[in-house]
Amino acid sequence: MQSLAEVSAPDAASVATAEELATLKQRMDEALALLKRAKLGGSERRNLYELPWYVIIGPPGSGKTTALMNSGLDFPLAAQMGAGAIRGVGGTRNCDWWFTDEAVLLDTAGRYTTQDSHAQVDKAAWLGFLDLLKTQRKRRPIDGAFIAISLSDLLLGSDAERAAHAQAIRARIQELYQQLGVRFPIYVMLTKFDLVPGFMEFFDSLNREERAQVWGMTFALDDGKSAEGPLAVFDSEFALLEQRLTARLVERLQQERDPARRDLVYGFPQQFAALRECLGEFLNGVFKPNPYEERPLLRGLYFTSGTQEGSPIDRLIGSMAQSMNLDRQHLARQTGTGRSYFIERLFREVAFGERGLVGTNPKVERRRKWLTIGALSATALVVLAVTAVWIASYRANQSYIAAVDQRVDPLARGIESLSPAQRDVLAVLPQLNAVQNLAGDAPSWAEGYGLYQGDMLGEESASVYRKLLIAVFAPRLVTRIEEQLRSGGSSDFLYEGLKAYLMLGSPDHYDADFIKAWISLDWERNLPRDLSPEQRQALHAHLDALLERRPPSARLDQDLVEDLRRQLQQLPVAQRVYDRVKRQRLPKDVPDFRISDAAGRDAPLVFARKSGKPLTDPLSGFFTYRGYREVFLTASLSQAGTIAEEQWVLGRDLNDAGDAANLALDVRRLYFQDYLRQWDDLLADLTVVPITNVTQAADVLRILSGPTSPFRKLLEAVARETDLQKGDRLVAAQVKKAADGTVDKLKQRLGSLVGQEEEGAREQPRQVDSDPISAHFAELNSLVSKGEGGNEPAPIDSLLEDMNALYVQVSAMAGASGDSLLGDAKNQVAAAASRVALSAERQPPVVQGLVKNVVNSTTSSMMGSVRNQLNAAWISDVVSVYRQSLAGRYPIAAGSSRDATLEDFGHFFGAGGVMDSYFRQYLQPYVDTSASTWRWQPGAAQKLGINPGVLHTFQRAAAIRDAFFRSGGMQPTVRFELKPVTMDAAISQFILDLDGQQLTYDHGPSRPVAMQWPSANGLGVVRLTVTPPPSSGRSGLTLEGPWAWFRLLDQSDLERGNSPDRFTLRLRIDGSSIACELRASSAFNPFKSRVVSGFSLPERL
């Protein structure tokens, strides 16, 4: 409401403008009333135009009002109005009216000129003031204008300020010319002349008469030929004023005895001369002619002083002291006498004496002139017109009769040429148009005035036109309908066409409006598209004229009629009635059903359509409770009655009331089938919006389970629209029991239409089935029902509470991270989701589907968050460690020259290491490790969204752990025994040294030697020595590094034995070989299948 008030409230500027204009109008009305009542200058009452009006404009504080008060003019109304007659002392608020015996002076507010405080208000008030002047004195709004500008503004103002004053005054002058429409003289008053240093001292000796004189320059009347206008002589005129001052200077110096005053007298002509430049610039800025503006009529420039008292003098003298090199206090001691200088004769002798210079408004004068001429001309024209009209009427009627005679013969020949075989209505259109217009159009003004002959000719023309319509137009319409019926079409098309056809042949069933509608529809669809609108209008006009009175019955093709009836009787009557009812336009107060309206404004946040249709897509209001009660029940029985009345179309009757009742029941059954299909399709198409993350899942659950749940609203709306027995549980027996007043009346009407027989003689109608709609949706309706009295909670409340509990858990999970996300938060969400899913199992299918959709989407989004967290931990905790310490190093990369450190290897693969910890913390609950090949628990891979192949990586890591870290911890330890078996005969002895652990063999008895990798001393050196050296000259092999033993195994042949802990190792040196038996300490050992080599990690799970 507050925002509405802000919008509707008027702004302050508009209010202020209205108030200002109202004040100006009030002052104008007061002034005009005074002028009408007062006797100015004698007993003669003067009107508005007898006294000249002058407007005074200028910036605020320019001394306009002071000049008027000290002008010496007589104000005769002061005695009548008291002090109030002299308004504006201390500043003019709007506009003050000064009534003298010689003129009316309008003193305007200075802000109207500058418009620099409240520009919008001041401009509107100024223009409104000009409109008032123009309204009251249309011919001559003003007789002149005074421009008042203070010399203090010119002396103390900057160049920019003076330019702004000049621009503002120039704009006001142009607005005066444009708004008032007259060219008036302009007088510039330079006020506060006394503020020029030395003024008082120089002119102090003037007497009253001398002070009343005009001191300035009056220009010659501007003829518009000079490019500079009157300002061309400004410099010369100003020089004359300087000469006057200089001529009087010696006299004044001799008269003055005070040295300080003599100094000021002496400097005054110089100070005055210093005004020339700034005055010239200012006047050029205001009055310099411009070809794009009205040329001002500048009459003169005059210096005045109204009073010499008050603080402005002291301030100005202080500001001037420095420029004159005088002592400030020396100047400040000069005070004025408060007398006026050079004002009085300026008004009386200069301005008022030239009151005739202003012209009148040319637009107003031209209007007055033309009004006078028009009145005289109109009188003469009336006399001439009356005489001419009778002559023109007589001649026009003679021409009219001759024109009708000329049209008759060609028309008769055209009608005779028409062939009965022609079927095209357009072929007869020219003849019909000609006969229809035979008598011509409505009489013109020249044919009237009592001499018109068209009425007699028109009656005969109308008779001929009617006969032509029946003879050539009607048969073509009948033939066209026959063509339509023979061409086939839908059952409804043939039925309606046959009805129109039979109406033309039977007076008993004639309906002009129906025939007209059928033919018009055919023309609209089948006439050539290039047919002009005029031709179409003519055809419709002829059709209206033909059917206005029933034409003679047409001869019908009975074979065609019988054939059509046989076709039409194949469609059940009930279906025909239902199709008619369904095509009816719904009343405006029976709205369509929209999910967006039913579920509320939050519906788009939670619901969507599987088909992609918007939630605003309507289900016809025909299939709503109101559509059923207010449209279908009425329309079905009405249409059943109509079909009964139209059984003549099919050539049969419905004479039995039972048949009519059964027909209504069949129509109702078709409606219910359609009703169910529409609602089932709509609800089956409803789903929950796609949920992509846990945060969105929480939002959806919050909205669905909240106080304004769109889920509850939608179900309640569906229940309202599908409980057709609401308010009248006996509606299913309406035909039999008349439980509804409206239905009972329509049933009686139907009975009267089809005819009622005696109670005992007629066949009883079939029993009505129970309402299938209410039965079909009974479970859904009971879900939102609040029980008897509406005081018990609806069953849906329990479901919504479970969904709210799920929302709470999901919301908590949305803010969880790390172990919490993968642990308790996930488990609690899963438990809450299971409760909701269990509750949904007991709900109607539509509710069950929607709720399960929400639960599944929520679970999926939860697992998606879990998957994201798993991947984040995988990359940061596993992959990054693997890349830094193991990737590309031996033994992971078999051919790499770089070794992984045993510490890094143990940290990654050891018991409690990186791989083992990640698996136990995140994945172990979802994996079955009991089988030889690990597998996911049922459904776990799909829920987590993890590639099933990831388990192979973890199982292989576990195999590495079991092979290298049997004792636990993160230090790899491998124990085994080596026993020489055979050795080449060329070798007498070989020695294997593994970090100080030696195995020696010289073809004697062999004994197993226990070894451990890595050894306690941690040298990381393996040496294999043979004696004697082979022919190549190399006697042995040395490998270094923490993985030297396994590098030796890679260079040798290692074959599995008959048990997982026994292997045959064949060592080779330049073609010589030594075979040993390798016995591992455990079946879980690193010697089988190269358990480490080729191990890799996926980038993401």
From Swiss-Prot:
Compartments where found: Cell inner membrane
Q: Which InterPro entries match?
A: IcmF-rel, IcmF_C, P-loop_NTPase, T6SS_TssM-like, TssM1-like, TssM1_hel, TssM1_N
Q: Which domain of life is it from?
A: Bacteria
Q: How does it sit in the membrane?
A: Single-pass membrane protein
Q: Where are the transmembrane segments?
A: 371-391
Primary location group: membrane
Protein keywords: Cell inner membrane, Cell membrane, Membrane, Transmembrane, Transmembrane helix
> What SUPFAM superfamilies is this protein classified in?
P-loop containing nucleoside triphosphate hydrolases
Tell me the null mutant phenotype. In the deletion mutant, TssB1 is still recruited to the structure containing TssK1, but the assembly of TssB1-sheath is aborted likely at the nucleation stage.
A GO cellular component term found in this entry reads: plasma membrane
What's one Pfam family the UniProt record gives for this protein?
A: IcmF-related
Q: What does this protein do?
A: Core component of the type VI (T6SS) secretion system that plays a role in the release of toxins targeting both eukaryotic and prokaryotic species. Plays an essential role in stabilization of assembled TssK1 structure at a fixed perimembrane site.
Designated name of the protein? Type VI secretion system component TssM1
Q: Which gene underlies this protein? A: tssM1
